């Protein structure tokens, strides 16, 4: 998945910097392992249909959630899985939740930030505008790969970034 690739790119850049400073392989591995806890990928799921089709939620939960315009907010966990960090009613409240998350887990501007999306960039573009209004500029846009995209469906969007230490 390109999302994972974005996270891996940040980790590789960090490790490369340590190597250039003459750190040992063991120290590079140890420090990178600690650093990876600061790298986050958060996203909003636009539809519950694909979570239901993938067996992640029941048909009833999907139907009720869709009627309520429920938008799950997810992140990659330290174990490499996907975890729910919150839920919002509607896309705008989901974006507000994500911006609040970024305030509580502040962005380290020394590292690149990437906006992420499944298919369809409209939501991602709106989120990038809100990020910009909050002083957060992304370096580029990465499409979420099929491994995750098939489970979260179209029009999902988010950000990959490094949290301040």
Predicted regions and their residues:
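Mixed-charge interfacial surface used for oligomerization/domain docking
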Residues: 2-165
């Amino acid at each position: 998945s390109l999302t994972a690739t974005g996270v891996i790119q940040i980790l590789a850049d960090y490790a490369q910097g340590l190597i250039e400073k003459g750190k040992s392989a063991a120290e590079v591995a140890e420090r990178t392992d600690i650093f990876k806890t600061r790298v986050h990928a958060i996203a909003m799921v636009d539809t519950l249909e694909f979570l239901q089709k993938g067996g992640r939620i029941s048909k009833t939960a999907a139907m009720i959630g869709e009627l309520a315009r429920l938008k799950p907010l997810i992140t990659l966990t330290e174990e490499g899985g996907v975890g729910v960090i919150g839920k919002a009613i509607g896309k705008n409240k989901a974006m507000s939740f994500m911006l609040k998350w970024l305030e509580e887990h502040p962005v380290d501007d020394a590292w690149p930030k990437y906006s992420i999306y499944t298919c369809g960039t409209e939501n991602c573009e709106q989120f990038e505008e809100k990020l910009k209004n909050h002083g957060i500029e992304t370096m580029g846009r990465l499409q979420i790969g099929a491994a995750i995209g098939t489970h979260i469906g179209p029009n999902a969007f988010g950000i990959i970034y490094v949290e301040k230490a």
